[in-house]
A protein has these predicted regions:
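Protein-protein interaction regions
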Residues: 20, 51-53, 61, 72, ...
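Intrinsic-disorder/low-complexity, polar/charged segments enriched in Ser/Thr/Lys/Arg/Asp/Glu/Gln
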Residues: 18-24, 79-81
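Long, contiguous binding/interaction regions
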Residues: 2-12, 39, 43, 66, ...
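C-terminal structural segments of small proteins and small subunits
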Residues: 75-107
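Generic signature of intrinsically disordered, low-complexity, basic-rich segments
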Residues: 1-2, 7-11, 31-33, 70, ...
Length: 107
């Protein structure tokens, strides 16, 4: 897990909100962020008192919306940035990064 933009590091982007926790992760399961993986992501995100956002190539979507996550088209090898705010933001980002790094417990 590392910190930094998920898209081109030279691209202009809005700064994350104060107190936001961020992590950059690579989708490493065989099917990418598909329907079952998105459901697991949303369920995990929902366990925390935090607002989670997912960013890929400059597009940012709420981590609570399965359809929006699917629309990111995060295939295997895609680099995404997780950002969270709220009381449990750090725990949420850590759990989501771990879920992704564990290939959504699929492979």
């Amino acid at each position: 897990m590392s910190s930094g933009p998920a898209d081109d590091p030279t691209a202009a982007r809005a700064a994350p909100p104060n107190g936001a926790v961020r992590a950059v992760v690579t989708i490493c399961n065989q099917k990418g962020l598909h329907a079952r993986a998105a459901v697991r992501f949303v369920k995990t995100a929902g366990q925390f008192d935090a607002e989670v956002w997912v960013r890929k190539n400059g597009t940012e979507v709420p981590g609570s919306d399965i359809m929006e996550l699917l629309m990111l088209g995060a295939a295997p090898g895609a680099v995404i940035e997780l950002t969270a705010t709220g009381r449990e933001a750090e725990a949420a980002v850590m759990a989501l990064a771990r879920l992704i790094e564990c290939k959504f417990d699929e492979d």
